[in-house]
């Protein structure tokens, strides 16, 4: 079985988001009068803290906090003029709930693995605070994350990230994106392609057509379409409905990478949107995992 592979960090690795990537995403949101907390960020190394500190007045931030896990953890606090450093008992992102309680938004690159990303997002959604974090692109294939996105609790930011700097100076290529509960408005995907059965083959194990690129989604097609995982960075819920994740698609007996299953919202009159129960799907296609 062919799987999408990503170069995630080992437990001891540190991934640093590049300043250029941060500066392309942060200005898309309103930070006026916000208390911002970077809770996985060593201010001596983190470009998140550096960016917010250097753009404090331009963004209209009220206060900036940062903590990070270390043997001698410190709480950094910046008010636009002075920076205060206070020893704390723990720099773990789960430990400093008192700061989470007073902040308005949490912005960071959490420990870089799909498992930690799930834990972190759960914590953020439970906090009731705004958040903007960097995490692996393919966590969308996790059932809980898919459900968060499908329900509108979790959104994908405006830009993508493909490379990170490691502490040793090397570069890690890890397809990633911004995950947030801020409002995000993506433009519709407009293409000049129409459906052609020779261009858009059907899966052997599910009644849907395959579209290998988001910019080739056929116009006017009312059925279910399988698109690459990276489609989620272009997803606009006003244009498409997320039907599920096809984890083991096959075309003409050949296994291909996982697909997100989508359907246009503006289905032709008289055509019903396809919704399949999980039990009936499992009965028919036992080798395919589909989320609802």
What annotation goes with each model-predicted range?
Residues 1-292:
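Class I S-adenosyl-L-methionine-dependent methyltransferase catalytic core
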């Amino acid at each position: 079985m062919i799987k999408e592979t990503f170069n995630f960090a080992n437990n001891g690795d540190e991934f640093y988001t590049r300043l250029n990537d941060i500066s392309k995403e942060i200005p898309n949101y309103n930070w006026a009068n916000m208390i911002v907390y970077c809770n996985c960020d060593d201010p001596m190394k983190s470009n998140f803290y550096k960016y917010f500190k250097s753009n404090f007045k331009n963004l209209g931030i009220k206060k900036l906090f940062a903590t990070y896990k270390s043997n001698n953890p410190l709480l950094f606090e910046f008010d636009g003029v002075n920076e205060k450093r206070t020893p704390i008992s723990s720099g773990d992102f789960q430990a400093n709930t008192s700061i989470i309680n007073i902040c308005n938004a949490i912005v960071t690159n959490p420990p870089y693995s799909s498992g930690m990303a799930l834990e972190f997002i759960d914590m953020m959604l439970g906090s009731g605070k705004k958040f903007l974090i960097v995490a692996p692109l393919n966590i969308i294939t996790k059932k809980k994350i898919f459900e968060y996105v499908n329900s509108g609790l979790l959104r994908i930011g405006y830009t993508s990230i493909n490379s990170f700097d490691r502490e040793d100076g090397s570069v890690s290529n890890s397809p990633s994106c911004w995950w947030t509960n801020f409002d995000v408005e993506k433009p519709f995907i407009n293409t000049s392609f129409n459906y052609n059965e020779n261009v858009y083959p059907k899966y052997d194990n599910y009644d849907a057509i395959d579209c290998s690129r988001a910019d080739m989604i056929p116009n006017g097609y009312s059925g279910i379409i399988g698109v690459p995982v990276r489609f989620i960075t272009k997803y606009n819920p006003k244009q498409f409905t997320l039907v599920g994740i096809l984890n083991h698609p096959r075309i003409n007996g050949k296994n291909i990478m996982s697909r997100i299953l989508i359907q246009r919202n503006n289905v032709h009159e008289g055509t019903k949107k396809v919704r399949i129960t999980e039990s009936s799907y499992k009965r028919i296609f036992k080798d395919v995992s589909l989320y609802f």
